[in-house]
């Protein structure tokens, strides 16, 4: 029997979020709706999820000793990683000491770098993937590009939101692609993956929930990325029954190997009826923000239920829907959003502003959500709303 205590009392059910971005913020809100006491941790102060949590801490989550000390101080019932840049060896140690890591410490460790998850998917599970090679230095990088062929995709083994990722289209770009990957890695310069370029009709995220009663799939989500960074997503993505069956089989296999409970974002390329595995995140996915308007239970609500061991009897899609990221470019510590009445003027349109304190370069600061009778109309509605938004730096 699942029980939940009262927050801020000795019997509270406590969750510690490691990483406090916009996805974590939505998870915190869903957990609090269920009466959970939440502690939000990040490397910088006043991160989005910290703004809504019961307590917040600012530490380097790559510092294993600091992380261990904080966990032992708070003694959470569940540790929920929201980002890759965490001392995963410490999570393994904490799990062995009796703490519950969501979904598992192994899943966090394998998916924090592209090498672990690619070797699991391709070499252990035999899932279809692009050709790939891992390299540590520039000379090996040049040889890998020659072997894989141009065009190819270059990524640091540890990065997120497209940082350090590029499509190499000519020999002349080899030095700049290497340098960009070295600058974009989460843990600094280092190992890189070179992937063969996959010709595909579209990309999907198949959100997959492992819960107390098994594995459930959300309707597939289509998306557009720019340099690996999500800009638009929609649900459902139309695909053949054969392709959907293959995608679900891949998702079930990879999430089953990672184990534990929670939501996973499984990214795949689709070409006709063929499906190729790309990546998996053992946490809510940015393209899944569309579920805030498309579903009865968003990916964040589903994650909260799965974490707590609560049942997920049904996943209901309300209507075709779309999301459009609000990406702000420039430099400011006091971004102001205007024309909001106009942005929200149409029915079934919504908005999330993440509360991020500053931008320096470009940064995702919010998302526009829209529902309609078709994905196409929902996308048009989201774009219309976006065009009305005013941003002052």
UniProtKB/Swiss-Prot annotation:
Positions annotated to bind ATP: 114, 155, 160-165, 195-198, 203
PANTHER family from the UniProt entry: FORMATE-DEPENDENT PHOSPHORIBOSYLGLYCINAMIDE FORMYLTRANSFERASE (PTHR43055:SF1)
Function: Involved in the de novo purine biosynthesis. Catalyzes the transfer of formate to 5-phospho-ribosyl-glycinamide (GAR), producing 5-phospho-ribosyl-N-formylglycinamide (FGAR). Formate is provided by PurU via hydrolysis of 10-formyl-tetrahydrofolate.
Organism of origin: Pasteurella multocida (strain Pm70)
Reaction catalyzed: N(1)-(5-phospho-beta-D-ribosyl)glycinamide + formate + ATP = N(2)-formyl-N(1)-(5-phospho-beta-D-ribosyl)glycinamide + ADP + phosphate + H(+)
Superkingdom in the source lineage: Bacteria
HAMAP family, A to Z: PurT
Top class in the EC scheme: ligase
Protein's name according to its UniProt entry: Formate-dependent phosphoribosylglycinamide formyltransferase
Residues reported to bind Mg(2+): 267, 279
InterPro entries hit by this protein: ATP-grasp, ATP-grasp_carboxylate-amine, ATP_grasp_subdomain_1, PreATP-grasp_dom_sf, PurT, PurT/PurK_preATP-grasp, PurT_C, Rudment_hybrid_motif
PROSITE patterns: ATP_GRASP
Coiled coil regions in record: none
Keyword Magnesium: yes
Amino-acid positions noted as binding N(1)-(5-phospho-beta-D-ribosyl)glycinamide in the UniProt annotation, renumbered to this chain: 22-23, 82, 286, 356, 363-364
Gene Ontology CC annotation, any one: cytosol
Gene3D superfamilies attached to this UniProt entry: 3.40.50.20, ATP-grasp fold, A domain (3.30.1490.20), ATP-grasp fold, B domain (3.30.470.20)
EC code(s) of this entry: 6.3.1.21
Keywords: ATP-binding, Ligase, Magnesium, Metal-binding, Nucleotide-binding, Purine biosynthesis
GO terms assigned for molecular function: ATP binding; magnesium ion binding; phosphoribosylglycinamide formyltransferase 2 activity; phosphoribosylglycinamide formyltransferase activity
Record family assignment: Belongs to the PurK/PurT family.
Pathway(s): Purine metabolism; IMP biosynthesis via de novo pathway; N(2)-formyl-N(1)-(5-phospho-D-ribosyl)glycinamide from N(1)-(5-phospho-D-ribosyl)glycinamide (formate route): step 1/1
Pfam families: ATP-grasp, PurT_C, RS_preATP-grasp-like
Segment forming the signal sequence: none
